[in-house]
Design a protein with these regions (language model features):
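A short beta-strand-to-alpha-helix junction
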Residues: 1-3, 32-41, 199-207, 269-284, ...
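Short, solvent-exposed turn/loop segments enriched in Gly/Ser/Thr/Pro and often Arg
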Residues: 1-15, 56-68, 90-94, 234-241, ...
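Formylglycine-dependent
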Residues: 23-24, 32-37, 49-52, 61-228, ...
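Histidine-centered active-site microenvironments of extracellular/periplasmic hydrolases
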Residues: 69-82, 241-242, 292-358, 364-367
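C-terminal cap/loop subdomain of S1 sulfatases and analogous C-terminal strand-loop tails that border
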Residues: 83-86, 91-98, 108-109, 321-327, ...
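A long, amphipathic alpha-helix that forms part
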Residues: 207-221, 255-311, 583-584, 588
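Active-site His/acidic residue clusters
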Residues: 213-273, 319-333, 533-536, 542, ...
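Cellulosome-associated attachment modules in secreted, modular CAZymes
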Residues: 581-644
Length: 644
């Protein structure tokens, strides 16, 4: 899927976003109705049927967080409530913004990468000082031992105070990849939390994510040696903000980044170097995870999977690359956040004892929902028996691709005929303020805070905007932004984007809001684009704007020769129409069983009396409150069986 939360939800639910309402990256304004429901049969619940214990470490981004408790009805227990036995991570979608005061040592903006640079930055740099640690310890650091003492201190969990500077380090400030707010749901049912000043939350996230994954594996192997297990590690990298990783994770000849400006998103070269180094660091840590867990071993300069570990390894990306990091032959203007190939075509790597003839490429269509099926197949679970038919699973089988090498042969037929992707607006009581992202030339209403908008390279047009001429109260819509910009108006992000493709062609449908006199009319207009696509190497045919086959003709004007674009358009249009029409509607049913009954009343009672009766999956009118108005919807539909 184009953004992170919908992809991650499909991994563990096996259902498309239009069935679950998880249509976009979950932010603080999004209601519980657009978060993974506790009534879903998630992967850990599914695998528990076969005795599996399960854990999530790092990022998952399936729910709200305490940044807005009103929209996070399950609180810090949410991952346990969704089925996992253990959670050690964070509920937010990515690292916090970089602390450009470097722990309160300078003014905001002095240190754009979150640490004091060396004196190559003549204005703000320092080559010696004291590294203060959160527990009260300290040590002297200088350029005699470190290229950039300030960065080395940050890597060691500290705050660097240059010699001659009178400043008290502030350990309560979040700082990009080097701090966090970790929530721990223990196997015994107890909970713990490591806030930003806690030494357990300090250090480079990719390293901490690996450490904690290994810690859980050691725990479960010791305490439950006879149980199969599933561990999901959600690495934060390389989500924005881009920030230099520890030097120890990089090749010895890696470029020095101590003088970089991490906040200068217009410096594409610096952005690319940091992207590459963060990927190198993640590669280093994945390697460490696999080796120290006993799943792989070194073989010269390579990594060799060990089939005797009896462990399946799956590595997958959750969405396409962020625009400044995109490389040819992909299209940075149609990357993360869009349903085009650059935004949804991601790596999927599988190793395991059942893989017949490893090192094969599979050229067939695979959807993120299909991982749900693969998890079940690995555990020996029949989804048709384990999941009620009314759940409308979209996952299709993946295991045959691993066990049957014939699928790698030229001319073989894949399991999927078509592949579907989508992104839209999550349900919210009020929309987010507008943010214009110049690299996409688009206005979006996704990000709830100015800092998040700016981390994505955007210009904030909400309250407190620093754009000249914008009122202090900001604008409340992208329509108002375009009225303000006049002839320099930008595109407005579609409220719904979806695409369906087969082996040769791709149909894209976009619904854009309509504006009148600087205000949204509440109406949207559907447009379609149609492309020829393939996975040829080294340069695949992808869906660039200039290649839209419908740009200059109506569908009935498409050619019928060659691969017959006209017939393919008609088939894909019929497929997507049928698919979207399969969405189930059952007013008053909050627990997804397609019935409105006493259980729904009991569940409504639970959520109307907990968390101050705010947002929940029983807030049927989507006003952010679980109240009598929602109970009235249950009462009006009581006894309905929507399966009939």
């Amino acid at each position: 899927m184009p953004p992170c939360s919908p992809s991650r939800a499909t991994f563990f639910e096996g259902r498309y976003p239009f069935r679950t309402n998880v249509r976009n990256a979950i932010v603080t304004l999004d209601l519980a109705n657009s978060q993974v429901s506790p009534y879903e049969i998630t992967t850990p619940r599914l695998l528990r049927q076969k005795g599996y214990v399960s854990a999530v470490v790092g990022k998952m981004h399936l729910s709200g967080s305490d940044l807005n408790p009103d929209n996070n009805p399950l609180g810090d227990d949410v991952m346990r409530e969704l089925g996992w036995d253990y959670f050690d991570g964070y509920l937010d979608g990515g690292p916090y913004p970089i602390d450009t005061s470097a722990g309160g040592v300078g003014d905001s903006g002095d240190y754009p990468c979150g640490f004091v640079p060396n004196t190559r930055d003549a204005a703000n740099g320092a080559d010696q000082g004291i590294c203060h640690l959160p527990g009260g310890g300290e040590s002297s650091m200088s350029i005699d031992d470190y290229d950039t003492p300030g960065q080395a201190c940050l890597e060691q969990w500290g705050v660097f105070v240059p010699t001659g500077v009178a400043a008290a380090p502030d350990f309560d400030l979040q700082n990009g990849y080097y701090t966090g707010d970790w929530i721990i749901n223990n196997m015994d049912g107890s909970d713990d939390r490591a806030p930003v000043a806690d030494s357990r939350s300090r250090g480079y996230r990719t390293v901490l994510e690996t450490d904690r994954a290994l810690d859980w594996l050691a725990q479960v192997r010791e305490q439950q040696p006879d149980h199969p297990w599933m561990l999901s590690v959600g690495y934060s990298a390389i989500h924005t903000p881009l920030q230099p990783p520890p030097r120890a994770l990089l090749p010895s000849d890696a470029e020095q980044t101590g003088g970089y400006d991490c906040t200068d998103l217009s410096n594409i070269r610096q952005q690319r170097v940091m992207t590459k180094q963060m990927l190198e660091a993640m590669d280093h840590e994945i390697r460490r995870l696999l080796i120290q867990s006993g799943v792989a071993r070194t073989a010269g300069d390579s990594l060799q999977y060990d089939p005797h570990s009896n462990t399946v390894v799956i590595i997958v990306g959750d969405n396409g690359t962020y625009a400044p990091s995109v490389r040819w032959p992909f299209d940075p203007t149609r990357s993360k956040g869009f349903p085009y190939q650059t935004g949804v075509w991601v790596p999927l790597i599988v190793a395991g004892p059942m893989v017949n003839q490893p090192d094969r490429d599979i050229g067939h269509l695979v959807n993120s929902t299909d991982l749900y099926s693969l998890f079940a197949e690995i555990a020996g679970i029949d989804l048709e028996q384990a999941v009620p038919a009314e759940r409308d699973l979209d996952a299709q089988s993946l295991l045959p691709y691993l066990t049957e090498p014939v699928y790698s042969s030229s001319g073989s037929t894949g399991i999927r005929d078509v592949n579907y992707t989508e992104m839209g607006a999550n349900l919210a009581a009020a929309p987010a303020p507008p943010c214009v992202i110049p690299s996409y030339n688009v206005c979006v209403q996704i990000f709830p805070q100015q800092e998040v908008c700016e981390d994505q390279g955007g210009s904030w047009y909400g309250p407190g905007s620093e754009v000249g001429g914008v009122p202090d109260s900001g604008f409340d819509s992208c329509c108002a932004v375009n009225a303000f910009l006049g002839e320099e108006a930008v595109d407005i992000m579609p409220t719904s984007q979806r695409a369906i493709r087969n082996a040769h062609f791709k149909l894209v449908q976009l619904e854009r809001p309509q504006c009148e006199a600087g205000e949204p009319t509440g109406e949207s207009v559907l447009s379609e684009e149609f492309y020829s696509v393939n996975e040829e190497t080294p340069v695949p045919e992808i869906d660039r704007a200039a290649e839209d086959l419908l740009a200059d003709t109506a569908p009935d004007g498409l050619p019928e020769d060659g691969l017959d674009p006209r017939a393919n358009y008609a088939a894909l249009k019929a497929d997507i129409t049928t698919l979207l029409a399969s969405a189930a509607e059952c007013p008053g049913d909050g627990n997804l069983d397609q019935r409105v009954d006493q259980q729904d009343l009991a569940n409504w009672q639970r959520f109307s009396t907990s968390n101050n009766g705010m947002s929940s999956w029983y807030d049927f009118n989507h006003d952010g409150h679980t109240d009598e108005a929602d109970k009235a919807i249950i009462d009006a539909n009581f006894g309905n069986d929507c399966r009939l």
